[in-house]
Amino acid sequence: MKKSILLALPFLFFAAKLHSYKLENLEKLQTTGACAKCDLSGANFYEADLQEVNLNGAILHHANLRRSNLSGADLSSAMLFRADLFGADLTNANLEDAKFCNTILPLGSISVKDC
């Protein structure tokens, strides 16, 4: 039992690092409405009002954007690998050069376009 826990620890640590973001990046987004090229991997934006935010080039791997309002947001060149956009409003959002790999899209399909 003890041996299996010790063997699992490196994997748990690695997984935690994949889903972490710097708190100052989240605070920057909340206060300024912009966080271009920020790493917000694993952030929970469930039902968040993110209208017209600037997330140009942001890293949003594993981010929960479910039912969030991203209308008019700049997501150009953003990386959204394994992000969840189910029910999100992307009306007039700039998605130019955004990367979606195993991302749940607003209507529930999974994008494998950029994998």
Model-identified regions with their sequence ranges:
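Tandem repeat scaffolds
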Residues: 19-115
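Short amphipathic alpha-helical "recognition" segments used for binding
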Residues: 6-7, 28
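Positively charged n-region of N-terminal signal peptides that target proteins for export
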Residues: 1-4
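Cleavable N-terminal signal peptides
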Residues: 7-8, 18
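Ankyrin-repeat-protein effector appendages
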Residues: 8-10, 114
